[in-house]
Protein backbone atom coordinates (compact mmCIF):
# COMPACT_ATOMS: atom_id res chain seq x y z
CA UNK A 1 0.00 0.00 0.00
CA UNK A 2 1.20 3.51 -0.82
CA UNK A 3 2.28 5.20 2.42
CA UNK A 4 0.52 8.39 1.28
CA UNK A 5 -2.83 6.58 1.37
CA UNK A 6 -2.48 5.07 4.84
CA UNK A 7 -5.24 6.08 7.31
CA UNK A 8 -2.51 7.06 9.77
CA UNK A 9 -1.57 9.88 7.39
CA UNK A 10 -5.01 11.43 7.69
CA UNK A 11 -4.84 11.29 11.47
CA UNK A 12 -1.37 12.83 11.52
CA UNK A 13 -2.62 15.62 9.25
CA UNK A 14 -5.49 16.26 11.65
CA UNK A 15 -3.17 16.33 14.67
CA UNK A 16 -0.90 18.84 12.95
CA UNK A 17 -3.90 21.03 12.17
CA UNK A 18 -5.17 20.80 15.73
CA UNK A 19 -1.69 21.61 17.05
CA UNK A 20 -1.58 24.72 14.85
CA UNK A 21 -4.90 25.84 16.29
CA UNK A 22 -3.80 25.18 19.86
CA UNK A 23 -0.62 27.24 19.62
CA UNK A 24 -2.50 29.90 17.69
CA UNK A 25 -4.87 30.43 20.62
CA UNK A 26 -1.92 30.67 23.02
CA UNK A 27 -0.21 33.31 20.89
CA UNK A 28 -3.50 35.18 20.48
CA UNK A 29 -3.94 35.19 24.25
CA UNK A 30 -0.53 36.84 24.63
CA UNK A 31 -1.60 39.52 22.16
CA UNK A 32 -4.86 40.11 24.03
CA UNK A 33 -3.51 40.01 27.59
CA UNK A 34 -0.51 42.25 26.93
CA UNK A 35 -2.50 44.66 24.78
CA UNK A 36 -0.32 44.15 21.70
CA UNK A 37 -3.28 43.92 19.32
CA UNK A 38 -4.71 47.06 20.88
CA UNK A 39 -1.44 48.94 20.44
CA UNK A 40 -1.13 47.92 16.78
CA UNK A 41 -4.73 48.99 16.18
CA UNK A 42 -4.19 52.36 17.84
CA UNK A 43 -0.63 53.24 16.85
CA UNK A 44 -0.15 51.36 13.59
CA UNK A 45 2.64 49.16 12.15
CA UNK A 46 5.89 48.73 14.05
CA UNK A 47 9.14 46.82 14.05
CA UNK A 48 9.70 44.63 17.08
CA UNK A 49 12.00 47.30 18.53
CA UNK A 50 9.49 50.08 17.92
CA UNK A 51 6.79 47.99 19.52
CA UNK A 52 9.08 47.23 22.48
CA UNK A 53 9.73 50.94 22.96
CA UNK A 54 6.05 51.79 22.70
CA UNK A 55 4.92 49.13 25.13
CA UNK A 56 7.93 48.72 27.42
CA UNK A 57 8.19 45.03 26.53
CA UNK A 58 11.13 42.83 25.56
CA UNK A 59 12.09 43.18 21.88
CA UNK A 60 13.26 39.61 21.37
CA UNK A 61 10.01 38.13 22.64
CA UNK A 62 7.97 40.55 20.55
CA UNK A 63 9.95 39.63 17.43
CA UNK A 64 9.31 35.93 17.92
CA UNK A 65 5.65 36.48 18.74
CA UNK A 66 5.12 38.75 15.74
CA UNK A 67 6.61 36.27 13.30
CA UNK A 68 4.52 33.51 14.83
CA UNK A 69 1.34 35.55 14.43
CA UNK A 70 2.31 36.37 10.85
CA UNK A 71 2.78 32.67 10.08
CA UNK A 72 -0.69 32.01 11.50
CA UNK A 73 -2.32 34.74 9.42
CA UNK A 74 -3.29 37.09 12.25
CA UNK A 75 -0.75 39.81 11.40
CA UNK A 76 0.85 41.17 8.26
CA UNK A 77 4.64 41.46 7.94
CA UNK A 78 6.62 43.71 5.61
CA UNK A 79 9.94 42.06 4.71
CA UNK A 80 11.52 45.38 3.72
CA UNK A 81 10.55 47.56 6.69
CA UNK A 82 10.39 44.54 9.08
CA UNK A 83 7.18 45.94 10.50
CA UNK A 84 4.18 43.94 11.67
CA UNK A 85 0.69 45.34 11.32
CA UNK A 86 -2.90 44.44 12.17
CA UNK A 87 -5.43 44.44 9.35
CA UNK A 88 -8.11 47.00 10.25
CA UNK A 89 -10.77 44.43 9.37
CA UNK A 90 -9.47 42.27 12.24
CA UNK A 91 -9.85 45.00 14.87
CA UNK A 92 -13.52 44.18 15.68
CA UNK A 93 -12.51 40.56 16.32
CA UNK A 94 -9.30 41.00 18.31
CA UNK A 95 -9.56 44.43 19.94
CA UNK A 96 -13.08 45.77 20.41
CA UNK A 97 -14.71 44.94 23.75
CA UNK A 98 -18.31 43.81 23.54
CA UNK A 99 -18.49 44.15 19.76
CA UNK A 100 -20.68 41.80 17.77
CA UNK A 101 -17.63 40.10 16.23
CA UNK A 102 -15.36 40.14 19.29
CA UNK A 103 -13.56 36.88 20.08
CA UNK A 104 -11.38 38.19 22.90
CA UNK A 105 -13.42 36.31 25.48
CA UNK A 106 -13.23 33.00 23.65
CA UNK A 107 -9.45 33.36 23.33
CA UNK A 108 -9.06 34.02 27.06
CA UNK A 109 -11.40 31.19 28.04
CA UNK A 110 -9.61 28.64 25.87
CA UNK A 111 -6.14 29.66 26.99
CA UNK A 112 -6.83 29.86 30.72
CA UNK A 113 -9.22 26.93 31.12
CA UNK A 114 -6.55 24.45 30.01
CA UNK A 115 -4.10 25.42 32.76
CA UNK A 116 -5.02 23.11 35.72
CA UNK A 117 -3.97 20.04 33.73
CA UNK A 118 -2.42 17.82 36.43
CA UNK A 119 -5.38 18.41 38.74
CA UNK A 120 -7.60 17.19 35.91
CA UNK A 121 -5.53 14.03 35.49
CA UNK A 122 -5.87 13.39 39.20
CA UNK A 123 -9.66 13.70 38.87
CA UNK A 124 -9.66 11.08 36.11
CA UNK A 125 -7.82 8.71 38.46
CA UNK A 126 -9.56 9.46 41.74
CA UNK A 127 -12.83 11.21 40.93
CA UNK A 128 -13.74 14.58 42.37
CA UNK A 129 -12.81 17.65 40.40
CA UNK A 130 -11.17 21.06 40.17
CA UNK A 131 -12.61 23.62 42.56
CA UNK A 132 -13.38 27.22 41.68
CA UNK A 133 -10.33 28.57 43.51
CA UNK A 134 -8.07 26.71 41.06
CA UNK A 135 -9.58 28.40 38.00
CA UNK A 136 -7.31 31.06 36.49
CA UNK A 137 -8.59 34.64 36.58
CA UNK A 138 -8.20 34.81 32.81
CA UNK A 139 -11.10 32.38 32.55
CA UNK A 140 -13.39 34.74 34.45
CA UNK A 141 -12.22 37.64 32.29
CA UNK A 142 -13.08 35.60 29.23
CA UNK A 143 -16.53 34.76 30.57
CA UNK A 144 -17.11 38.46 31.18
CA UNK A 145 -16.00 39.36 27.65
CA UNK A 146 -18.18 36.75 25.94
CA UNK A 147 -21.11 37.78 28.12
CA UNK A 148 -20.64 41.41 27.15
CA UNK A 149 -20.88 40.49 23.47
CA UNK A 150 -23.71 37.98 23.79
CA UNK A 151 -26.05 39.97 26.00
CA UNK A 152 -25.49 43.27 24.21
CA UNK A 153 -26.18 41.84 20.77
CA UNK A 154 -28.60 38.97 21.41
CA UNK A 155 -30.44 39.28 24.74
CA UNK A 156 -32.16 42.64 24.32
CA UNK A 157 -32.28 42.69 20.51
CA UNK A 158 -33.36 39.13 19.73
CA UNK A 159 -34.35 36.94 22.66
CA UNK A 160 -36.57 39.39 24.55
CA UNK A 161 -38.30 40.46 21.32
CA UNK A 162 -39.46 36.86 20.88
CA UNK A 163 -41.20 36.88 24.27
CA UNK A 164 -43.83 39.61 23.72
CA UNK A 165 -45.52 39.42 27.13
CA UNK A 166 -42.19 39.66 28.92
CA UNK A 167 -41.16 42.64 26.78
CA UNK A 168 -44.50 44.43 27.16
CA UNK A 169 -44.57 44.13 30.95
CA UNK A 170 -40.95 45.25 31.26
CA UNK A 171 -41.67 48.28 29.08
CA UNK A 172 -44.76 49.19 31.09
CA UNK A 173 -42.72 49.03 34.27
CA UNK A 174 -43.47 48.39 37.94
CA UNK A 175 -42.24 44.81 37.63
CA UNK A 176 -39.25 43.05 39.15
CA UNK A 177 -36.67 40.97 37.30
CA UNK A 178 -34.14 38.75 39.11
CA UNK A 179 -31.01 37.48 37.36
CA UNK A 180 -29.73 34.43 39.25
CA UNK A 181 -26.05 33.66 38.71
CA UNK A 182 -25.49 37.06 37.12
CA UNK A 183 -21.69 36.82 37.12
CA UNK A 184 -20.19 40.21 36.29
CA UNK A 185 -23.68 41.54 35.62
CA UNK A 186 -23.54 42.01 31.87
CA UNK A 187 -27.00 40.50 31.30
CA UNK A 188 -28.62 42.39 34.17
CA UNK A 189 -27.08 45.70 33.10
CA UNK A 190 -28.22 45.36 29.49
CA UNK A 191 -31.76 44.60 30.66
CA UNK A 192 -31.78 47.52 33.09
CA UNK A 193 -30.60 49.87 30.35
CA UNK A 194 -33.24 48.63 27.93
CA UNK A 195 -36.15 48.77 30.39
CA UNK A 196 -35.61 51.72 32.77
CA UNK A 197 -39.16 51.57 34.22
CA UNK A 198 -38.63 48.10 35.74
CA UNK A 199 -36.47 47.02 38.67
CA UNK A 200 -33.59 44.57 38.21
CA UNK A 201 -31.71 42.47 40.76
CA UNK A 202 -28.53 40.54 40.07
CA UNK A 203 -27.55 37.68 42.39
CA UNK A 204 -24.29 35.73 42.33
CA UNK A 205 -22.46 33.33 44.63
CA UNK A 206 -19.07 35.03 44.30
CA UNK A 207 -18.42 38.39 45.95
CA UNK A 208 -15.74 39.39 43.37
CA UNK A 209 -18.37 39.02 40.63
CA UNK A 210 -20.72 41.33 42.53
CA UNK A 211 -18.00 43.93 42.99
CA UNK A 212 -17.13 43.76 39.31
CA UNK A 213 -20.79 44.02 38.31
CA UNK A 214 -21.26 47.11 40.46
CA UNK A 215 -18.25 48.78 38.85
CA UNK A 216 -19.41 47.92 35.32
CA UNK A 217 -22.88 49.27 36.10
CA UNK A 218 -21.36 52.47 37.47
CA UNK A 219 -19.27 52.92 34.31
CA UNK A 220 -22.40 52.30 32.21
CA UNK A 221 -24.36 54.91 34.15
CA UNK A 222 -26.98 52.41 35.33
CA UNK A 223 -27.92 52.79 38.99
CA UNK A 224 -31.54 53.83 39.58
CA UNK A 225 -33.21 50.53 38.69
CA UNK A 226 -30.45 48.02 39.40
CA UNK A 227 -29.04 46.28 42.47
CA UNK A 228 -26.47 43.49 42.84
CA UNK A 229 -26.26 41.13 45.82
CA UNK A 230 -24.08 38.20 46.87
CA UNK A 231 -26.28 35.12 47.36
CA UNK A 232 -26.22 31.35 46.99
CA UNK A 233 -29.07 30.12 44.80
CA UNK A 234 -29.35 26.99 46.95
CA UNK A 235 -30.74 29.16 49.77
CA UNK A 236 -34.38 30.12 49.09
CA UNK A 237 -35.36 33.80 49.03
CA UNK A 238 -38.44 35.10 50.81
CA UNK A 239 -39.12 37.62 48.04
CA UNK A 240 -40.93 36.71 44.82
CA UNK A 241 -40.29 38.28 41.41
CA UNK A 242 -42.34 38.87 38.29
CA UNK A 243 -39.53 37.46 36.19
CA UNK A 244 -36.52 35.31 37.00
CA UNK A 245 -33.72 34.51 34.57
CA UNK A 246 -30.75 32.15 34.56
CA UNK A 247 -28.17 32.53 31.83
CA UNK A 248 -25.72 29.62 31.50
CA UNK A 249 -26.12 28.68 35.16
CA UNK A 250 -28.14 25.51 35.71
CA UNK A 251 -25.73 23.09 34.01
CA UNK A 252 -22.90 24.37 36.25
CA UNK A 253 -24.75 23.96 39.53
CA UNK A 254 -23.75 21.54 42.25
CA UNK A 255 -27.40 20.58 42.78
CA UNK A 256 -29.39 21.76 39.75
CA UNK A 257 -32.68 20.27 40.94
CA UNK A 258 -32.51 22.13 44.26
CA UNK A 259 -31.59 25.24 42.33
CA UNK A 260 -34.67 24.84 40.15
CA UNK A 261 -36.82 24.43 43.28
CA UNK A 262 -35.46 27.74 44.58
CA UNK A 263 -36.20 29.39 41.25
CA UNK A 264 -39.77 28.10 41.23
CA UNK A 265 -40.34 29.54 44.71
CA UNK A 266 -38.94 32.88 43.55
CA UNK A 267 -41.25 33.23 40.52
CA UNK A 268 -44.71 34.68 41.09
CA UNK A 269 -47.60 32.48 39.99
CA UNK A 270 -48.26 34.78 37.02
CA UNK A 271 -44.56 35.24 36.34
CA UNK A 272 -42.10 33.91 33.78
CA UNK A 273 -38.81 32.06 34.19
CA UNK A 274 -36.36 32.71 31.35
CA UNK A 275 -33.80 29.93 31.06
CA UNK A 276 -30.85 30.20 28.72
CA UNK A 277 -28.39 27.35 28.54
CA UNK A 278 -26.13 25.53 26.12
CA UNK A 279 -27.82 24.32 22.94
CA UNK A 280 -27.52 20.53 22.91
CA UNK A 281 -29.35 17.33 22.01
CA UNK A 282 -31.08 14.84 24.31
CA UNK A 283 -28.63 12.14 23.15
CA UNK A 284 -25.12 13.61 23.47
CA UNK A 285 -23.98 11.48 20.52
CA UNK A 286 -26.26 13.63 18.34
CA UNK A 287 -24.44 16.87 19.14
CA UNK A 288 -22.84 18.15 15.96
CA UNK A 289 -21.03 21.25 14.76
CA UNK A 290 -17.65 22.96 15.00
CA UNK A 291 -18.19 24.08 18.62
CA UNK A 292 -19.04 20.64 20.05
CA UNK A 293 -15.40 19.73 20.86
CA UNK A 294 -15.10 23.09 22.62
CA UNK A 295 -18.17 22.27 24.72
CA UNK A 296 -16.79 18.94 25.91
CA UNK A 297 -13.39 20.47 26.64
CA UNK A 298 -15.02 23.23 28.70
CA UNK A 299 -17.05 20.61 30.54
CA UNK A 300 -13.92 18.70 31.53
CA UNK A 301 -12.03 21.83 32.52
CA UNK A 302 -14.81 23.81 34.20
CA UNK A 303 -18.53 23.04 34.03
CA UNK A 304 -18.52 19.37 35.00
CA UNK A 305 -15.36 19.30 37.11
CA UNK A 306 -16.25 22.23 39.40
CA UNK A 307 -19.58 20.59 40.19
CA UNK A 308 -17.97 17.20 40.88
CA UNK A 309 -15.34 18.88 43.07
CA UNK A 310 -18.21 19.71 45.42
CA UNK A 311 -19.88 16.28 45.21
CA UNK A 312 -22.36 17.72 42.75
CA UNK A 313 -24.43 16.34 39.89
CA UNK A 314 -21.77 17.12 37.29
CA UNK A 315 -24.24 17.74 34.46
CA UNK A 316 -21.53 19.21 32.29
CA UNK A 317 -21.66 21.77 29.50
CA UNK A 318 -24.06 19.73 27.36
CA UNK A 319 -25.95 18.28 30.30
CA UNK A 320 -29.14 20.33 30.05
CA UNK A 321 -30.92 19.44 26.79
CA UNK A 322 -34.61 20.18 26.32
CA UNK A 323 -35.73 16.83 27.78
CA UNK A 324 -33.78 17.49 31.00
CA UNK A 325 -35.18 21.03 31.19
CA UNK A 326 -38.72 19.65 30.97
CA UNK A 327 -37.95 16.93 33.53
CA UNK A 328 -36.69 19.45 36.08
CA UNK A 329 -39.58 21.83 35.40
CA UNK A 330 -42.11 19.06 35.94
CA UNK A 331 -40.46 18.03 39.21
CA UNK A 332 -40.45 21.54 40.70
CA UNK A 333 -43.90 22.67 39.57
CA UNK A 334 -43.45 24.63 36.37
CA UNK A 335 -46.29 23.77 33.99
CA UNK A 336 -45.31 25.06 30.54
CA UNK A 337 -41.97 25.06 28.76
CA UNK A 338 -41.67 26.87 25.44
CA UNK A 339 -38.46 26.82 23.46
CA UNK A 340 -37.72 30.17 21.81
CA UNK A 341 -36.17 29.98 18.37
CA UNK A 342 -33.04 32.12 18.29
CA UNK A 343 -30.18 32.77 15.91
CA UNK A 344 -27.48 32.15 18.50
CA UNK A 345 -25.24 29.18 17.61
CA UNK A 346 -24.44 28.11 21.17
CA UNK A 347 -27.49 28.81 23.32
CA UNK A 348 -31.08 27.67 23.72
CA UNK A 349 -33.67 29.93 25.35
CA UNK A 350 -36.82 28.72 27.12
CA UNK A 351 -39.86 30.67 28.32
CA UNK A 352 -41.14 28.77 31.36
CA UNK A 353 -44.32 29.42 33.35
CA UNK A 354 -45.82 28.13 36.62
Can you name each region flagged by the protein language model?
Residues 276-331:
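C-terminal alpha-helical "lid/dimerization" subdomain adjacent to the S-adenosyl-L-methionine
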Residues 257-269:
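A short glycine-rich, Lys/Arg-flanked "PGG" loop and its adjoining helix->strand segment in the class I
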Residues 48-53:
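A short acidic, leucine-rich amphipathic alpha-helix
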Residues 332-354:
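Core SAM-dependent methyltransferase catalytic element
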Residues 57-68:
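Short amphipathic alpha-helical interaction segments
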Residues 41-47:
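Short capping segments at the starts of secondary-structure elements
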Residues 2, 6, 15-22, 27-31, ...:
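Conserved Class I S-adenosyl-L-methionine-dependent methyltransferase catalytic core
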Residues 103, 114-251, 256-258, 276:
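Conserved adenosyl
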Amino acid sequence: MDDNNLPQKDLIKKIVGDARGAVGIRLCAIGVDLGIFEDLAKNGPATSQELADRMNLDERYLREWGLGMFSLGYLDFDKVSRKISLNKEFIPVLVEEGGKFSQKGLIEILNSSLLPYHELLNSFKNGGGINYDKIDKGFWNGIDQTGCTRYRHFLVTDWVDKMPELKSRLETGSVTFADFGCGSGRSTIEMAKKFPKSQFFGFDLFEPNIERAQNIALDAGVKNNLKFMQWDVSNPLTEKFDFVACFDLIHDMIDPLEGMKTIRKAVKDDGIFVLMDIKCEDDPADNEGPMVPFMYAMSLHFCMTTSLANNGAGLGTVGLPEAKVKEYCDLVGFKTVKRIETDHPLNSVFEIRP
